[in-house]
UniProtKB/Swiss-Prot annotation:
Keywords: Glycoprotein, Glycosidase, Hydrolase, Lysosome, Signal. The active site is at E359 (proton donor). GO terms for cellular component: lysosome; membrane. InterPro entries: Beta_hexosaminidase_sua/sub, Glyco_hydro_20_cat, Glycoside_hydrolase_SF, Hex-like_dom2, HEX_eukaryotic_N. This is Beta-hexosaminidase subunit B1. The keyword Hydrolase applies.
Amino acid sequence: MIILKRNIVFLLIIIIVLGIFIATSIEIKNYKLSLNQNKNEISKNPPIWPAPFYGQFGNNSILISKEFNFTIISDSTLLLNKTLSKYYNLIFTQDNLINSSSNTLNKLNINLKSKNEILKFGFDESYKLIIKNNENSKLEGNTVYGIMRGLETFYQLIKYNFSDNSYFIENCLPLIINDKPRFPHRGVMLDTSRHFYSVDTILKVIESLSYNKFNTLHWHIIDSQSFPLSSKSYPNLINGAWSKSEIYSYHDIKRIIKYGKENGIRIQLEIDMPGHAKSWSVGYPDLLPHGWNDSTTTIKCPDYDVPLDPSSPLSLPISFGLLSEFSGTDYGYNPNYDDKSNNLFNLTVDDLFHVGGDEIEYQCWNNSKRIKDWMNENNLKTFQDVAKQFQLKIIKQLLKIGKIPVLWEDTFQLFYKDLPKDVIVEIYHDQSTAINATNNGYKIISSIARYWYLEYSYSNWIRAYNFEPTLNISKSNIHLVLGGEGAIWSESIDSSNLFQKLYPTSSAIAERLWSPIYYTNLLNAKSRLQSFRCSLLKRGINSAPLNNSSPLSAFSCYNS
């Protein structure tokens, strides 16, 4: 009996080992098959992230001479020169002892086709990079932003040999890359209300986004918990900030927008309304519903999520004033500020403006006699009618001042087919809402929480990489998917752990939004992402390891 049991155990072990071997063989076979089927899918060497639209690679290498320079062969701009200088300094941080010769790479010709530097939705980021030999190497872009994306690719191609103090490009020449993004809107949302981030931290976020070939920082600047936005139209609003030192001044905002342009990153502001408005009331108490915090009522209003009172005589003027002030326009809603000499109304902000519209707690309006009387006067039957009227006025105001309204999906669910078609809907609950919105002709931005919310403990790069934002959307509606965003909600995140939460998961989102849809091979992606993570660490971006929130033991970054 004992011998029989041992034989059974031995047989089970053999079956398990054989099963693992077969599964591994199938996985490797499928991996090779995937690479063979997708002829454009980039090899693990060179490990470019995000993968380009098209790449053709040889097997040769080349040394880079110490005389190497970027040679502009077209018209130049200050921003182009600044970008080239930035990447030169990022690349060449060590001694280079290689003299120039006919066998070394001595220059990269830069051809800028247009001096147009307007940074708005849909701007051109395409580029072409050719490296054959010293006499036939160039980077070409229709705009300086295409040159930026191409320089990031060039940066990732270059390696350094400490044994002979040389820079080189390895085993991929001759090289031709034709690259462009799959989606026009690719970003990360950063919540600066739950925790305040310094301007320098936000600038570092912008820089890291450019390395990932993102193009948008969605700045969720205010919320219920704090109001750190300094308004010269309504200066008492900053009384809702966490402290007097945790405020974004007008100068700070201009600095962030300027740095965004220098890195090819649009800054899309979000001023969430009418929900999440408790912090507004610290400076202007009449903005909230009377009786919202009445402890004697049976229907309680959550004190962290109190909405504006649309019946308040201040609600629309302050809301319109903020939209006008931070859109760079003035339509008479800024009574406390009429001195335009200091460029308050010259903010260069994005053409998309996010106004929230999510999670309106209707029970907070239920305890207010003023709201109910106002509803009767205006023939509004339900609190949904109240929300619709307010939101429609905000949407029309944004369109009046030349901005494209973006709202969370709650507003689409509130209006359904009656929502103006100018509105872009940001989807965060479920893909079924994305399908429903696009079937009804609405443009969408995808930010599905279970895949692309970065603060969750289960958030990881594989989960993010495997989500396809066009999943089950009809072919005729694919054009309505404008792109997507990873989201950082900051209840449990501050400057101490921000970048570990951002990366590498956001990098996976970056490739999903930039690269062709057929890039789905996880083995290939893991190899390239490990290399890219090392390049982030080298540049001071503190990305977490791929498989854990912190290192488990001693390893090279290429194996973490």
